[in-house]
Amino acid sequence: MKYRLLCNKITVVALSALLSLSAVSCGRLDTSKLDGNALTVIEAESKAEVKKTEDSSSKKEVEVNEEEKEQPSYTCSLVCVGDNLIHDNIYNEALKLGGGEKYDFTQAYEHVTKYIEGTDVAIINQETLVTDSVEPQSYPMFASPTAVGDKIVDMGFNVVSMSNNHVLDQGEEGLISSLDYWDTKGIVHYGAYRSQEDADTIKTMEVNGIKFAFLGYMEHTNGNYLSGDGAQVIYLDEEDKIKAQIEEADKMADVVVVSCHYGTEIQNELNEQQTEITPKLVEWGADLIIGTQAHTISTCEYLDKPDGGQAFVYYGLGNFISTMYDTKSLVGLIGKLNVVKDPDTNEVTFENVKAIPIISHFEGDSYYGDWYNCTVYPYAEYTDELFAKNYVEGFTRESVEQCLSYIPDEFLSIE
């Protein structure tokens, strides 16, 4: 009898629960009329359903978030600057600003850091070897303290070109020391290599679904040469080697960046080498060509590619910073653009391409004395007062505008 009563009670409770759940689903349950056992069952079932729904929603959210993470933007920002040419006036002042015990290059770049920081791909031509293996040296055999490298990486530069005529100023030992330093910074460096195997390995980086390859070549190395068995550089007259490298890079990357140290010093006009080899680089697969060496600015333009796309060429970015005593050498450019890739066709285009003028500034009391306040300004912020203080005789707004006349209006951006 007790068993039968117990079974009946269980049956009643179960039926009540089922009826109640049905009522809940219809939105018309009066829980005040349920006994405790039935209410407990209902609450448990309801909580289970809610948890199941929450788990399902949470799972869907995770799946959506994962899908969002897996989809790159296929667009990125890029800046490139010219020769980071560290004369003795610059590093001597940095040593004073560091209290005589360390180098502080903050003043040198403080006015232009805003153009670099936060950029996805930021490229600089490091014109002087960065190494602490020798004492800092100036023209004609440059060597700069590693504090220079620390500063430019801190600014946001993550790609360093070493393809320039001063790369062998301290011989193979100095070059290897500089390569060792850059290896510690976690950035891409190219244009000079520790071995043939290193030279044959194309340097790449991928940003937001866009893969970049970097190659660098120079016209000469000031009469200094390597033995051939160890460290390597590639000269612009080695066209067969350059062609093979660019074609290989074109197969493995969306954007092939080629740094060329070419042009006639202190001349805005293009020379024969520039006009002859640049179209070849584009024909072989170069997408962005960055020109340095002349220490003055030159024109920039799009060139048609064989595949129907367009490459862009900055023929001469001038100096990023220096204390060269020449009015033309005080004017440089920051190249700036957006790189956009169509994920369906893999076609890459450059948008919002700019050439932003900058001014190397320094003051002094005599030609053979120390020059000070060595820094670089955006031309947009270079006041008449600064023109008056600049130590280079004859440096005027008119002389700047003369240099800027070589830049097409569609790209010139004074900002």
Residue ranges of model-derived segments:
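Sec-dependent N-terminal signal peptides of Gram-positive bacterial secreted proteins and lipoproteins
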Residues: 3-31
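Acidic, metal/ion-coordinating pockets
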Residues: 26-55, 59-415
